[in-house]
Amino acid sequence: MSNGDQHAQPQDIWRETVNEGERRLTREPRGLAATGLVGGLDVMLGLTAVIVLTGAVATITNPELAHVVGSLAFGIALVFVVIGRSELFTENFLVPVGAVYSGRGSRTALARMWSLTLLSNLVGLAIVAAILSIDGVVPQGALDAAGELAKTIEDRNLAAALGSAVIAGLVMTLFTWVALAVGSDGARIALALLIGFLLLGPSLNHAVVSFGEMLIAAFSGTTDMGVAEIAFKEVTAIVGNLAGGLGFVTATRVVQVRGESG
């Protein structure tokens, strides 16, 4: 936590969650849009590192191992997010929800925050994806690696896509909770690097990250997914992320805090 307590109690983490949630919910729309846009840019920088490293490693080993190695690089995106204080749509399944639950924010403000953050995240992704697709900006092997990431998303049936999205929502919301609990930037950086690998290693279906993967592949012509299919995959990711984040983390933390406070 911000006071440097390395052994913060759940009630302390919840108190900080609610305070931060109230602050986020009262920001002006342009502030929400700006932090969301930067969050999208941060994710794409991490994905750029992933596809470049994966493409390079794929020239000397099998694609599966290349993907695992490349996934190690994605954590830098979450480092940018948590240290630079940009925001991702899935970060807001705990903090502002806690404020609304505690009576210190409205559902309307929460809906506004979710929609603006997600939209600006996606705009940030699209900007960088368009640049990466320009011939010569990154090696062709990197674009091919993006195509493989998109193929993983494309090949999942609905049950697998939803299940993967639920886990992604759980992981990101748990990341938010633990990041509030730790007392130093160094610990947050280490946590971000670990969570980044946990997201990319199994190619979890994350509404922002997966959309970025599909956009790079679509803009560069390394996938045959069309607009309708990409949109359906995105909606599936959003639904699963919400279920995992709200249902498995936020709800259980509320029960935990209420139980321990008597």
Language-model segments: residues:
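Alpha-helical transmembrane segments and their helix-helix packing motifs
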Residues: 1-262
